[in-house]
């Protein structure tokens, strides 16, 4: 049985009084680097059109699914290159390893990799919303660069979905940013196990995460009454991977750190911070 999906969670939250407009930020007046340069150089958008282009795509996306990362323009603040594991990720992909951005939204982090020299044929993205993947092409204007067959609309909890049909055991790296918190703790264990199955069953297979965490779980996770998410702290994150190892029998080396992030400054919920983590198969 497939567990509750994010869009079902949102419908439940709206019914319980959650107002998505608190997640909607006024239109941008400037697009920060490196996104601005990527849109100019990679997407060939004239510099004087970049801001209006981004605003239009954001509004269309927020109408499809009102996530905070969309309403607050988090998708223009690229994060993958800030990971201390990015040099390894980029080098491995340049050498033929395959990388999946899970919960990729517009696939913006994939475009960072491509801009930095990664071949599009080694990159994959997946999101539950096909419209997000389509809007990614509208944002970056690059259908010729990133194969459409490499952007897969799937539910990571559904092992019969195209993601598993096409990629089980074939990936070397999975990047997960601001995605896992939309699942409860038990569902996150399932997601982690499924991700391990997508990766090659060999030492060095790597998961790199950017995780929404909180200082006071008791307070913040109480928001589950309206938006049933699960926010980690460092201890619960480490516990998650201990459980995953016990249930799967796969030995993992888990590296975790707290990292500065622009998201923290504008997140509407209290006590938010960002955990970075790398989970390597031993």
From Swiss-Prot:
Pathway assigned to this chain's UniProt record: Secondary metabolite biosynthesis; terpenoid biosynthesis
Coiled-coil region(s): none
Binding site residues for S-adenosyl-L-methionine: 127-128, 155-156, 247
Enzyme class: transferase
Signal peptide: none
Keyword Transferase on entry: yes
EC number(s) stated in the UniProt entry for this protein: 2.1.3.-
Keywords recorded for this protein, A-Z: Methyltransferase, S-adenosyl-L-methionine, Transferase
GO BP: austinol biosynthetic process; dehydroaustinol biosynthetic process; methylation; terpenoid biosynthetic process
Keyword Ribosomal protein: no
Description of the deletion phenotype: Impairs the synthesis of austinol and dehydroaustinol.
GO molecular function: methyltransferase activity
Subunit note: Homodimer.
Additional information: In A.calidoustus, the austinoid gene cluster lies on a contiguous DNA region, while clusters from E.nidulans and P.brasilianum are split in their respective genomes. Genetic rearrangements provoked variability among the clusters and E.nidulans produces the least number of austionoid derivatives with the end products austinol and dehydroaustinol, while P.brasilianum can produce until acetoxydehydroaustin, and A.calidoustus produces the highest number of identified derivatives.
Functional note: Methyltransferase; part of the gene cluster A that mediates the biosynthesis of austinol and dehydroaustinol, two fungal meroterpenoids. The first step of the pathway is the synthesis of 3,5-dimethylorsellinic acid by the polyketide synthase ausA. 3,5-dimethylorsellinic acid is then prenylated by the polyprenyl transferase ausN. Further epoxidation by the FAD-dependent monooxygenase ausM and cyclization by the probable terpene cyclase ausL lead to the formation of protoaustinoid A.
Family, per entry: Belongs to the class I-like SAM-binding methyltransferase superfamily.
Protein name according to UniProt: Methyltransferase ausD
Record organism: Emericella nidulans (strain FGSC A4 / ATCC 38163 / CBS 112.46 / NRRL 194 / M139)
Gene name of the record: ausD
